[in-house]
């Protein structure tokens, strides 16, 4: 037993099982729960990985039977050695699936089995099951994915390893300029270009939607409150649903012409509200500084053109 005042034991979870059963789904779910995940770790590197002080974060180690030095007995030995170390708690998780379902999955994806690339997938499945049999017998946790979808597999991992905590879904609130195209990472996009534009108020043009007077100007649009209310209602519906489905990251983007005033205003207000409700929120104003520099360049160019036109005796059109 560790001394009473020492740090709690570091958690290490070994994940293994046949190809196609869902190892990657499980290791990704553990990573979303806060584990430091290492995929396809060769067993020969395990001692070096665990040298020194125990890690601060729990470890999830995916052991692939296709790796060159794989041996079920060596993995069991490494696991049992770690299990006896008071500085660690260890779990051996076996991801299983019925051979017929594995064969169907290979057929649907038209992939070859890695252990029998030139033969029927059934041959590779049989070879792998024999290799892994001792691990299946020794496992602390067995997850049979035969009847499970990807989402239900994730839910099972969460149930087993989150200690009744749902995984945090990180939400990024972004503002952007339509002149620079839609952000490809956005899951939800709201177009703010119909709202009144502070760009045309000289005292606000150089400011942005992070400032209260710009926000107040945008909020004076008669449609603003209804627009914001509808957005809030939609997010109240969708965010819990996305979280329930196992989504770990969500990007909500607000766009306007320059990405400086209206989109930033809505992004700021939405991020503040979600944070107050307990969501894990980050903000990114993608184009706000670019818009400022471009406006400055345009103003200098306009001044130069005005001066040139005045010299020629012509007035420049606004």
Curated annotation (Swiss-Prot):
Keyword hit for GTP-binding: yes
Binding residues annotated for GTP, in chain numbering: 64-67
Biased composition regions of type Basic and acidic residues, renumbered to the chain: 286-302
A GO term for molecular function: GTP binding
One Pfam family, short name: RapZ-like_N
Entry annotated with the keyword GTP-binding: yes
Domain of life assignment: Bacteria
Binding site for ATP: 17-24
Xref: InterPro entries: P-loop_NTPase, RapZ-like, RapZ-like_N, RapZ_C
Chain intervals for the UniProt region annotation (Disordered): 278-318
Entry function: Displays ATPase and GTPase activities.
Family: Belongs to the RapZ-like family.
Full protein name: Nucleotide-binding protein Jann_0539
Species of the source: Jannaschia sp. (strain CCS1)
């Amino acid at each position: 037993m560790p001394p009473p005042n020492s740090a709690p034991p570091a958690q290490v979870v070994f994940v293994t099982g046949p190809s196609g059963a869902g190892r990657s789904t499980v290791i990704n779910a553990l990573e979303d729960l806060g584990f430091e995940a290492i995929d396809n770790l060769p067993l020969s590197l395990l001692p070096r990985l665990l040298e020194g002080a125990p890690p601060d974060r729990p470890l999830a180690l995916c052991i692939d039977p296709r790796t060159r030095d794989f041996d079920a007995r060596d993995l069991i030995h490494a696991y049992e050695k770690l299990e006896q170390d008071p500085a660690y708690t260890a779990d051996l998780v076996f991801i299983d699936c019925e051979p017929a379902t594995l064969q169907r999955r290979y057929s649907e994806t038209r992939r070859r089995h890695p252990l029998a690339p030139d033969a029927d997938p059934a041959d590779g499945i049989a070879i792998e099951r024999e290799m892994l049999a001792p691990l299946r017998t020794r496992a602390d946790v067995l997850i049979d994915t035969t009847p499970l979808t990807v989402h239900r597999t994730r839910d099972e991992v969460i149930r087993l390893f989150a200690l009744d905590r749902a995984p945090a879904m990180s939400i990024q609130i972004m503002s952007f300029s339509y002149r620079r195209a839609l952000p490809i990472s956005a899951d939800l996009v709201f177009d703010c270009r119909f709202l009144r534009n502070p760009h045309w108020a000289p005292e606000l043009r150089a400011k942005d939607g992070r400032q209260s007077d710009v926000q107040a100007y945008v909020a004076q649009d008669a449609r603003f409150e209804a627009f914001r209310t509808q957005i809030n209602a939609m997010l109240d519906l969708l965010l819990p649903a996305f979280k329930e489905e196992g989504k770990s990251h969500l990007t909500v983007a607000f766009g306007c012409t320059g990405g400086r005033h209206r989109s930033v205003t809505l992004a700021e207000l939405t991020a503040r509200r979600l944070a107050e409700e307990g969501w894990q929120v980050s903000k990114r104003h993608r184009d706000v500084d670019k818009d400022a520099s471009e406006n400055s360049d345009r103003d200098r160019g306009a001044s130069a053109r005005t001066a040139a036109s005045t010299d020629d005796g012509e007035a420049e059109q606004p």
